[in-house]
């Protein structure tokens, strides 16, 4: 065999070897990518939780899995509905007249079609009056264009302008005033039931109570909070004009800032739990509260929640009021499960309505220890709650 033929065979073998190496590399990359995808989608949801930044309340800081909000657009057409012929809604109709609730929804132009209209088509229609607060008008939503910019840094400013608008135009149209986000789902009938004994002239507000930053606690913005008419009056007339009582610039977390303002004008942070000590306002979707160990005990929520909270079915009142981070599609699912699905042969008899309270009087709080916290910036609080 000549030297030239040996050289040619050597080059050929080297080429085949390089080709096999290249193919092996490609196969390895494909397998590695597939394994990585499998690992990501099989990892428990709590691995995606982000640490909470107490000075920034937002999606990236909350215990909400990113995949839960993928289908944000919701249905293009109204899903429709039907009446229940034998349904007895006498009490709900009575409360609709006696406990008037104005619901205002924090939204923005990019969410008008994506989120806000689905609030209007589902739970929003059960409010006595529904108003969308944005920075641009919208004929379908009848949205109010507030004189404030969009973005997280303007949420406090938008909240102030919203309540000023409500006080000027609608203060006598309702007894209670609910603020909710465009991804909050609210069972309005249950809220009326909770509010029924209270006078709207009592300076009080209710929601999911957190304990840092404000001595008496403050209500989570995402879960929604509801102010009495007197609370709105004090906020707009007494707190907002006074920079010593209320932050004048637009920066800051809106739920914390309004909590400080309301405390400064002696509006009480009420206890919204039921008689069994179960919560009614929730900052996450039902799954996150109902499934034990869904959230790591080191997650910020457990340090922020004001009252001791159980996991599992005991987490939540049978008369729960709100959940947060609800996608548009989930709103229709919840609407069906709550207002249409019926187990045959089981009739739910509502509890008797409680007695009315005098102006300034509150229901006694559940006697128990408030939760403690050791996180930076979170005040420790373990004294037994007192009857107000």
UniProtKB/Swiss-Prot annotation:
Disruption phenotype: Morphogenetic defects in which the ventral nerve cord is greatly elongated and the brain hemispheres are misshapen. Glycans are attached at residue 88. In stage 12 embryos, expression is seen in the amnioserosa and by stage 16, also in the central nervous system, predominantly the ventral nerve cord and brain. Also in embryos, preferential expression is seen in the ejaculatory duct and the nurse cells (but not the oocyte). In larvae, expression is seen throughout the nervous system and imaginal disks. Adult females show expression in the nurse cells and adult males in the ejaculatory duct. Pathway: Protein modification; protein glycosylation. It is a single-pass type II membrane protein. A glycoprotein binds at residue 300. One of its GO terms (biological process) is negative regulation of hematopoietic stem cell differentiation. Residues 378-388 have a biased composition (Basic and acidic residues). GO terms for cellular component: Golgi membrane; membrane. Residues 1-21 are cytoplasmic. Its cofactor is Mn(2+). It holds the Pfam family Fringe. Changing residue 213 to A: 25-fold reduction in activity. One of its GO terms (molecular function) is beta-1,3-galactosyltransferase activity. The keyword Mitochondrion does not apply. Disulfide bonds join 103-127, 246-261, 315-316. It catalyses: an N-acetyl-alpha-D-galactosaminyl derivative + UDP-alpha-D-galactose = a beta-D-galactosyl-(1->3)-N-acetyl-alpha-D-galactosaminyl derivative + UDP + H(+); a 3-O-[N-acetyl-alpha-D-galactosaminyl]-L-threonyl-[protein] + UDP-alpha-D-galactose = a 3-O-[beta-D-galactosyl-(1->3)-N-acetyl-alpha-D-galactosaminyl]-L-threonyl-[protein] + UDP + H(+); a 3-O-[N-acetyl-alpha-D-galactosaminyl]-L-seryl-[protein] + UDP-alpha-D-galactose = a 3-O-[beta-D-galactosyl-(1->3)-N-acetyl-alpha-D-galactosaminyl]-L-seryl-[protein] + UDP + H(+). UDP binds at residues 106, 108, 150-152, 158, 181, 324-325. Its main location: membrane. The chain crosses the membrane at residues 22-42. Residues 368-388 are annotated as: Disordered. Glycosyltransferase that generates the core 1 O-glycan Gal-beta1-3GalNAc-alpha1-Ser/Thr (T antigen), which is a precursor for many extended O-glycans in glycoproteins. Belongs to the glycosyltransferase 31 family. Beta3-Gal-T subfamily. Binding of glycopeptide acceptor substrates to the enzyme is mainly driven by the GalNAc moiety while optimal binding and kinetic parameters are reached in the presence of both the GalNAc moiety and the substrate. This is Glycoprotein-N-acetylgalactosamine 3-beta-galactosyltransferase 1. The gene is C1GalTA.
